[in-house]
Amino acid sequence: MMTNFKFALKNLKVNFTSENIDKLRFYIEKVLLFSDRFNLVSNNVRNFDAMLLHALDSVSGLPIVKDKNLRQVLDVGSGAGFPGIVLALFDRCRKYVLLERSNKKAIFLKMISLELGLENVEVLEHNVEEEQNKYEFITIRAFGDIRKYANILGSILKSGGLIMAYKGKFDKVEFEMSYVKNLFDKVEIKSSEVISDKERYFLLLYDYKC
């Protein structure tokens, strides 16, 4: 499975070292080890290969991040660290701010970022509605229906910024897009093809209007 992960990284044109791979393996093992204690992942995905698929899905967004040539990314609802920790691990030149409302998960994120030596990670512990700063790039994954949070996320998006939402089935993404397209200057659905047997897309929301 790790061989497939490396192959996917090469297809995505993501540079990596053996240290990156070792740290990813360490991270996944820590997620599995501390899942019960910190309420990190559901029971049905508590195995290494399932976690590696989450990591692969996470890193698939990195080319979009790099294409924007920005200095900082906000990951809202970071949970166990997918995608925030994974992106930060393979993209050390950018700062990743991980926003997580759960105290337990925020503690884990702080712990694992220290153990991985991720100096480009900052963890914030509060609700997204309480965030005061604005960001040029925002990521969300496993965050529910975008219709509920579009205005909230838009309010902390800098002018000219981009929200990248990791999504599943196309018909659902298209349905959500129809409700939020008038809130942004441009809305786009982009296919993610790194996991061949799963339907995955990015919903990209450019420049909040309100």
Curated annotation (Swiss-Prot):
A GO cellular component entry from the record: cytosol
Pfam families: GidB (PF02527)
EC number(s) per entry: 2.1.1.-
Enzyme class: transferase
Subcellular location: Cytoplasm
Principal place of residence: cytoplasm
Alphabetical list of InterPro entries matching this protein: rRNA_ssu_MeTfrase_G, SAM-dependent_MTases_sf
A GO MF label: rRNA (guanine-N7-)-methyltransferase activity
Keywords noted in UniProt: Cytoplasm, Methyltransferase, rRNA processing, S-adenosyl-L-methionine, Transferase
Residues annotated for S-adenosyl-L-methionine binding in this entry: 77, 82, 100-102, 128-129, 141
Function: Specifically methylates the N7 position of a guanine in 16S rRNA.
Family, similarity comment: Belongs to the methyltransferase superfamily. RNA methyltransferase RsmG family.
NCBIfam families from the UniProt entry: rsmG_gidB
Name of the protein this chain belongs to: Ribosomal RNA small subunit methyltransferase G
Organism: Borrelia recurrentis (strain A1)
Gene: rsmG
